[in-house]
Regions:
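Domain-level detector of nuclease and nuclease-like folds
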Residues: 1-117
């Protein structure tokens, strides 16, 4: 990504839900797009629901690594609101660890512009 960062330090469980910023067990390497476009909307849905209702949410984020790749291919995000049996929040989504215009080697983490040698 010319002049910009491709990779972010990604919280598996978003900061707005944990208040933790540097827990190594909650961090993976992800693309800027996965972090700010892919994951953030789901994290915010849960955070807003909790703030508005004070209800509990079962929430799990699982990074998916293929074979011995160093970089996750994405994360599975699952959420279920407890007190209302999922009528407030209920989703199970997969967010891909991609960046538009960039080709990523998930085994090594190396990247290049699509179409470049």
């Amino acid at each position: 990504v010319p002049g910009k960062y491709l990779y972010n330090r990604c919280h598996l469980i978003g900061y707005q839900l944990t208040g933790e910023n540097a827990n190594k067990l909650n961090l993976i390497t992800c693309t800027r797009q996965m972090n700010t476009v892919g994951m953030l909307k789901w994290e915010n849905k849960v955070a807003n629901y909790i703030k508005e209702t004070k209800n509990n949410v079962l929430y799990r984020v699982t990074p998916k690594y293929e074979n011995d790749n160093l970089l996750a291919s994405g994360v599975q995000i699952e959420a279920f609101s407890v007190q209302d049996n999922g009528s407030g929040i209920k989703f199970n989504v997969f967010v891909k660890n991609v960046q538009d215009g960039i080709e990523i080697d998930y085994k090594t983490g190396n990247s290049k512009l699509k179409g470049s040698e």
